[in-house]
Swiss-Prot record:
Domain of life assignment: Bacteria
Organism: Bacillus cereus (strain AH187)
Gene: cidA
Pfam families: LrgA
Subcellular localization, as worded in the UniProt entry: Cell membrane
The organism's taxonomic lineage, starting at the top: Bacteria, Bacillati, Bacillota, Bacilli, Bacillales
Any single biological process term in GO: programmed cell death
Entry protein name: Holin-like protein CidA
UniProt topology in membrane: Multi-pass membrane protein
């Protein structure tokens, strides 16, 4: 019974991802469909169209098995080691700088939203 419940929850999560992909494709948006799907899920959770309990176990399972989604990346690293040896330092710098930028923007935005929320209450 647990596997049926888990499968149903994962299927529901994938439905949001597929819907986001479809919207991105139909509207020719420059945003990845998975991001649109996550946004749709957020809206559905916010307005109680989808209850947290309906997806909790499936989301937890996917997070626990997250390492499996990185295996193709590891294989690509091995496959393109010549490219990495040529551009490795550049790639590492780009990854570090972009991670720093994302972290800074996320922190500043969170701080701004918390200040705004604090002033409203």
């Amino acid at each position: 019974m647990k596997w049926w419940k888990l499968s149903g929850q994962i299927l529901l999560l994938f439905c949001f991802a597929w819907t986001g992909e479809w919207i991105a494709k139909q509207a020719h948006l420059p945003v990845p469909g998975s991001i649109i799907g996550i946004f749709l899920l957020l809206i559905s959770l916010k307005f109680n169209l989808v209850k947290k309990e309906w997806i909790q176990d499936g989301a937890d399972f996917l997070l626990k098995e997250l390492i499996l989604f990185f295996i193709p990346s590891a294989v690509a690293v091995i496959r393109y080691k010549d490219t990495l040896s040529q551009y490795g330092i550049d790639l590492i710098l780009i990854i570090m700088i972009s991670t720093l930028c994302v972290t800074l923007v996320t922190g500043l935005l969170t701080e701004l939203l918390l200040k705004r929320k604090g002033s409203v209450q």
